[in-house]
Amino acid sequence: AGEPDFDTIDYVKEAAIKAINDGQTKYTIVDGTPELKDAIIEKFKRDNGLDYKRENISVNSGGKHTIYNAFMATLNPGDEVIIPAPYWVSYPDMVMLAGGTPVIIEAGIDNNFKIIDR
């Protein structure tokens, strides 16, 4: 269910211990601290040649949470949302909670898990 099958890398452990020792133990800004956004911006620039500003970056607690937030922010009652199958079991419910209508489209192994026009 998404849990890693490897130990946490040492530099991540060390950074977490340092943050605790530095008193960084409170809730942070909901969509990401400036330092985290700057690190994400630098990663996209370095690895992908993409330029973003802080206001273009929003950090969330996971993929499903991000998708749910997007549905809640953008769907109008009755909007159709295409969900490629196979899909995570909660996707249709997330669409319906936001007032949308899920439309399931098969995108299985025969199509290399891509939606194709028939």
List the predicted regions and their residue ranges.
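N-terminal small-domain helix-loop-helix segment of the aminotransferase-like
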Residues: 1-62, 69
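Short beta->alpha connector loops
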Residues: 63-65, 87-88
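PLP-dependent aminotransferase-like
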Residues: 72-118
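A conditional alpha-helix N-cap/helix-loop micro-motif detector
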Residues: 60-64, 113-114
